[in-house]
Every structure is written in C-alpha cells, then in structure tokens.
A protein has these predicted regions:
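C-terminal beta-strand-rich structural cap/linker in extracellular carbohydrate-active enzymes
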Residues: 157-182
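Long, low-hydrophobicity ectodomains and other hydrophilic envelope-associated domains
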Residues: 1-138, 154, 160-162
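Surface-exposed loop/edge segments in extracytoplasmic proteins
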Residues: 143-151
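Surface-exposed loop/turn and intrinsically disordered segments
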Residues: 129-130, 142, 181
Length: 182
C-alpha cells in the first residue's frame, strides 16, 4: 500500500501524474493538464484532442489553449449550474514584447499595450442538465455582453459551443457566458 489511492492514475513510466484528490491530472508526455473540481474544470490543449475532464470536453481547437468552464452559481456544481463562464485562453503577449530565445523563458523587453491575443477556433462541450434553453454570449474584458453565440444541446444532453474568436464582434475575447434565455 502507498500514499495514493488504488484508483490513482499516476504512472511515472508514462509521465502521468495525478494528485491524491484526483482533481489534478498532468500528462507530461503529451503536454496535457486536466483540472476537475465540482464547480470548475479546465484542460490544457496542446496537441492531443479531444481532451476531457468530467463535465468539460474540448472536441477541437485550432491552436494551443487553456479552456475552462466554471459554475457562477455559488453553491451549485458545474453540471447543475444555470449560469456558466467558459474561458478559452490562447497565447497573449504585449505588443513589441521580446524574449532572449524562441522558447520564451526569459523576457528581454516587456513590451506595451495593447495585448495581442492569438485567435482560435474551438468546439467545446459541457455536460449540464440545468440549462434547458441555453443562451451564450461573448463577454468583453469589462464583463459586458458583446454578442450572442449559437449554442445547442446534443442528443446526449451536452451543451455544444462552436466558435472562432477571430470573428467576435469587437475583437477577440476569451470569455463566454452561458445562461438561460431571457
């Protein structure tokens, strides 16, 4: 017997590491990272798709991105929340930012505003049974709704979002709100 529970997926030979609570899973061999908590789930998408947590699944992404879904209802888990925030965070750098090498580990010049955000296309599914008639909105950096996005429920009950951040009105944003239609 060891410190980790028997169902823990840690496999050092395959460079897979899971926390003792099961909330964090890192696959070093595939540059993957999955965070699973009752109200927040996130995945790091680099190369291998699809990537799935428990309720959140990234079916496709045209660029590397961190994707997360969070319940905005204080006491409700992600799958039962009627108000969600999805974050699709791609590469973001200050204008004129410079590094000492291509791997960008040491900053040579911090750069200046505006921040340049890499655009991307993604297909994201969230298993949620509370939102019967969902509506999705791109949010600006100030939290205001900028435009409505198409969202649909699949036959197996998932909420499905497909979007291209390069086509958002007002420019790219990593933030999408999902709520019941008003």
């Amino acid at each position: 017997t060891g410190i980790l529970p028997a169902e823990n997926r840690t496999d050092m030979a395959r460079r897979i590491y899971e926390s003792d609570t099961g909330e964090i899973l890192m696959n070093s061999a595939e540059n993957g990272f999955v965070l699973t908590t009752p109200r927040l789930e996130g995945v790091l998408v680099r190369e291998t798709l699809p990537v799935r947590a428990d309720k959140l699944e990234v079916l496709s992404s045209s660029v590397p991105a961190m994707t997360a879904a969070a319940s905005l209802d204080a006491a409700k888990p992600l799958g039962e929340s009627s108000h969600l925030l999805v974050v699709y965070s791609t590469d973001a750098l200050n204008s004129s930012m410079r590094f000492t090498s291509p791997d960008r580990t040491v900053i040579e010049e911090v750069g200046e505003l505006p921040v340049l955000i890499r655009t991307g296309r993604a297909k994201i599914a969230v298993r949620n049974r509370a939102l019967r008639n969902p509506a999705a909105y791109v949010l600006g950096f100030n939290g205001e709704r900028r435009e409505r996005l198409p969202i649909r429920r699949t036959e197996d009950g998932k909420l499905l979002l497909e979007f291209d951040t390069g086509n958002f009105a007002g420019g790219p944003s990593p933030f999408i709100e999902i709520t019941g239609q008003e």
